[in-house]
């Protein structure tokens, strides 16, 4: 049986919010089967619960944020991506600020944090959202599509017309039947341009951004002294974001995701298009090994092998 997962123990981290620029304390706590991923704004009185939900996504300018009752938790996508990559279904996330800390701008520190807490398989079958027919969403020359697939594959292409990005691969395919989230995706950092910083900060964004938590470029080159972590780090970060954005549906997807110039807004829209067509998806579990697609068995191999 492919089982649900949570953490073995509670783990804590402290970092800076990318957009607010203030200190943020984060606590990740185990949760019972079928709880899902639930964010808790513990700085509010009373504390506010915000479950992962594509219909709660409110602000997609520079990140994915959840909103409830006028209160928000922003920049959830890197943590959500790490949870999806490690197959964690159930978790309580306590945060004392309106956003998740950015850490190093990738999912790598979240992966380390989660693995250090230990991952526990639970006595309940993992529930997948299987795409049954193609759905698509377009805005101008940007598009995103979900199609039936016995596993989880992402094909992504980007266009930025910038020499530092154009000199790298601008398209990538990641299939978790053969690729590893931890090895191939998790370390890709968010990126931005110096000329955008003044505008963003005037709008209350990226106040905590620095070379410590993003790839930063001027008009011609990457400014980070250590360069890139992957030859295709830019497009891989877009894949990392997409994995986190899609996991807000509450279940791992069995689907092929294809996108061109997509971002948080389009990723959220394609989930809404999918969920609103009840004939386009179903919830499935794999309680018998013989019925489990090989790609799923590989991606969600027992924890000892995955960790």
Swiss-Prot record:
Its EC number is 3.5.1.108. It comes from the Bacteria. It catalyses: a UDP-3-O-[(3R)-3-hydroxyacyl]-N-acetyl-alpha-D-glucosamine + H2O = a UDP-3-O-[(3R)-3-hydroxyacyl]-alpha-D-glucosamine + acetate. Keywords: Hydrolase, Lipid A biosynthesis, Lipid biosynthesis, Lipid metabolism, Metal-binding, Zinc. The keyword RNA-binding does not apply. Pathway: Glycolipid biosynthesis; lipid IV(A) biosynthesis; lipid IV(A) from (3R)-3-hydroxytetradecanoyl-[acyl-carrier-protein] and UDP-N-acetyl-alpha-D-glucosamine: step 2/6. It is an enzyme of class 3 (hydrolase). Belongs to the LpxC family. Catalyzes the hydrolysis of UDP-3-O-myristoyl-N-acetylglucosamine to form UDP-3-O-myristoylglucosamine and acetate, the committed step in lipid A biosynthesis. This is UDP-3-O-acyl-N-acetylglucosamine deacetylase.
